[in-house]
């Protein structure tokens, strides 16, 4: 399976739940995350960064160092997804976290 299939699946699943998914281009900044994920406007919370890998591949040491640096600065970094199942788990987790934040701030359900 190609990385592009995992990437498309992530984008489709998140956008179907109201998230905005942006591809990042960071010239001169090796090791940056692939995607920026913005929550729906009515759900408060930080954006997330996520790395997409081919199945079975892991982030390079430079990428891990970059992720750790960003986390130390308070950035919400999701390590990486490398399969359709990992995408599904990540989307479910993001949706649940966003829904919980919505409930805490409004006291209302969707």
Residue spans for each PLM region:
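Acidic-basic catalytic patches of nuclease active cores, encompassing PD-(D/E)XK
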Residues: 1-26
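Short amphipathic alpha-helical segments and helix-helix/interface helices
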Residues: 11, 64-68
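Conserved catalytic cores of phosphodiester-cleaving nucleases, focusing on short active-site segments
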Residues: 35-37, 48-54
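Short, solvent-exposed loop/turn segments that connect beta-strands within catalytic domains
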Residues: 41-46
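Basic, glycine-rich
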Residues: 76-110
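Active-site-adjacent loop/helix micro-motif of nuclease/hydrolase catalytic cores
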Residues: 56-65
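A generic structural signal for well-ordered alpha-helical segments
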Residues: 14, 70-71
């Amino acid at each position: 399976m190609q990385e592009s299939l995992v990437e498309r699946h992530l984008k489709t699943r998140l956008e179907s739940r109201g998230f905005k998914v942006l591809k990042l281009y960071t010239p001169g900044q090796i090791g940056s995350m692939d995607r920026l994920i913005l929550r729906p406007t009515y759900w408060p919370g930080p954006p997330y960064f996520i790395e997409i890998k081919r199945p079975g591949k892991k982030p390079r040491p430079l990428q891990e160092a970059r992720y750790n640096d960003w986390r130390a600065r308070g950035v919400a970094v999701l390590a990486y997804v490398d399969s359709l199942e990992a995408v599904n788990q990540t989307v479910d987790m993001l949706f649940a976290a966003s829904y919980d934040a919505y409930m805490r701030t409004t006291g209302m359900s969707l």
